Amino acid sequence: MIKKIILFFAVLIAIVIGQQPLNVVPYPQQVSIGTCVIPVAPGSILIESNIESATFSVSMDRYTNLFFPFSNESEPSSNESFLLSVTIYSDDETLQLGIDESYSLSIEQGSYQLKATNIYGAMRGLETFKQLIVYNELENSYSIVCVSISDSPRYPWRGFMVDSARHYIPKNMILHMIDSLGFSKFNTLHWHMVDAVAFPVESTTYPDLTKGAFSPSATFSHDDIQEVVAYAKTYGIRVIPEFDIPGHAAAWGIGYPELVATCPDYAANVNNIPLDISNPATFTFIQNLFTEIAPLFIDNYFHTGGDELVTGCWLEDPAIANWMTKMGFSTTDAFQYFENNLDVTMKSINRTKITWNDPIDYGVQLNPETLVQVWSSGSDLQGIVNSGYKALVSFAWYLDKQNPDNNIHYEWQDTWQDFYAADPTNNISTNAENIIGGEATMWAEQINQVNWDVRVWPRAIGIAERLWSAQSVNSVSLALPRIGHFTCDLSRRGIQSGPLFPDYCPMQDDLVFTMKPNTKLSKSEIKLILNK
């Protein structure tokens, strides 16, 4: 009883002095603290849902195994169990942009209630519930505070870009990445699959494409891709492929040299080589390839890159230059021609195109339905949303930069504060409603499975909260203790997320950091999840 009273007053004091009383990340929209603290014992919390779902069953099993990282054999065993009752109002498991991720969570003495419209809101609620379970190392005990939470994300698109082209990232490591993203309530994995240096995606239509991979073993099969998509679905994470064209296309030409431009003066930099858009066979190739690849993903969006096109290579290639002259094309016209043809392909495969902002910078008029990902600047973002395009913000969240622009921090991990301060609407005066979210990006020139965790976490936590929590939740000083607590929690879950300030994070004696997911899906589970 004394322990419960002390904890209750600690929470009360936090409220009085203006701190956020719950160590929950991202911070919920509405929180009401109750007047009780409930002791719980390892293994005592059971989850029961009112619907049958193979997808949600994976999530329930996952969190059941995560609730209690430490045993408390020193305390007397108790037969008392606590039932977390999950009520889901719809069995529709469609996972697309704009799904309802809201949930309500009520913890009272003798009653744990989680309610959501669908399984994806329930997944967000399970993560919050996990974070509410507090471990007291001195007492070797667990407790949970009585609380009422009503929560939903600020933005429907909360993405993270993984680059598995510049360094091959094994499938199991990508599944491990999905674990970390799901814990932080990201809901979109933007998979940058192909770039100038490598083409690691297997194609049954064009098998020589993987001649552009780093190694025959450094490739992704159709089965690999579908396992990633199914695993991500168990976290409510959409997976969107990116095939970056027309620039950054050199790897396409290793297996099929007729697809790319020839420009010796530019060839010293592999990033300079674009597709040959004067050859009609190029567009037939793209059409056939994307028709094969798109069904492996369940999302309605398909990212086609479009960044850093070196048009000088087109002008140096005699065949392309002659074609442009014949057509009366400037380089902007040629780029427009390519994007128009790409729109035809997107329509045929029933996908909505995403592109980086570069085509607009070149003067290309994109299809109004195109979603524009802005990596350049806030001023470009303002012009894009003023033109009526829906947009994603990324320019402020380049995690491969250990020292982001205007960094003033001594420790590079403190750059989470810069990411945290970068609200998508900063300096946006009009049409902010066209910003539907954003993405953190981790380009992989110097990143592979060995150092991915430590370069991403805990810095990406600030981005996760910025995209989920209310705009008014923006105090670095209030966020710091919560994020510090969560980074310790991530470490206990097998994510190598380091500290932000001097403290002590108790770890399990047998904790092993692996490049593997915390759950393994069987082939039958993958099929059930993808077909629901």
UniProtKB/Swiss-Prot annotation:
Keywords from the UniProt entry: Glycoprotein, Glycosidase, Hydrolase, Lysosome, Signal
Gene3D superfamilies noted in UniProt: Chitobiase/beta-hexosaminidase domain 2-like, Glycosidases
Signal peptide, first to last residue: 1-18
GO process annotations (BP): carbohydrate metabolic process; glycosaminoglycan metabolic process; N-glycan processing
PTM comment: The N-terminus is blocked.
SUPFAM superfamilies the record matches: (Trans)glycosidases (SSF51445), beta-N-acetylhexosaminidase-like domain (SSF55545)
Molecular-function GO terms, alphabetical: beta-N-acetylhexosaminidase activity
Compartments, record wording: Lysosome
Active site: E308 (proton donor)
Primary residence: other
Annotated InterPro entries: Beta_hexosaminidase_sua/sub, Glyco_hydro_20_cat, Glycoside_hydrolase_SF, Hex-like_dom2, HEX_eukaryotic_N
Residues bearing attached sugar chains per UniProt: N72, N79, N350, N427
Classification via Pfam families: Glyco_hydro_20, Glycohydro_20b2
GO cellular component terms given for this protein: lysosome; membrane
EC number: 3.2.1.52
Reaction catalysed by this enzyme: Hydrolysis of terminal non-reducing N-acetyl-D-hexosamine residues in N-acetyl-beta-D-hexosaminides
PANTHER family noted in UniProt: BETA-HEXOSAMINIDASE, BETA-HEXOSAMINIDASE SUBUNIT A1-RELATED
Function (record text): Responsible for the degradation of GM2 gangliosides, and a variety of other molecules containing terminal N-acetyl hexosamines. This enzyme plays a role during the slug stage of development in the maintenance of pseudoplasmodia of normal size.
Family in the record: Belongs to the glycosyl hydrolase 20 family.
Subunit structure: Dimer.
Protein name as annotated: Beta-hexosaminidase subunit A1
Taxonomic source organism: Dictyostelium discoideum (Social amoeba)
Gene: hexa1
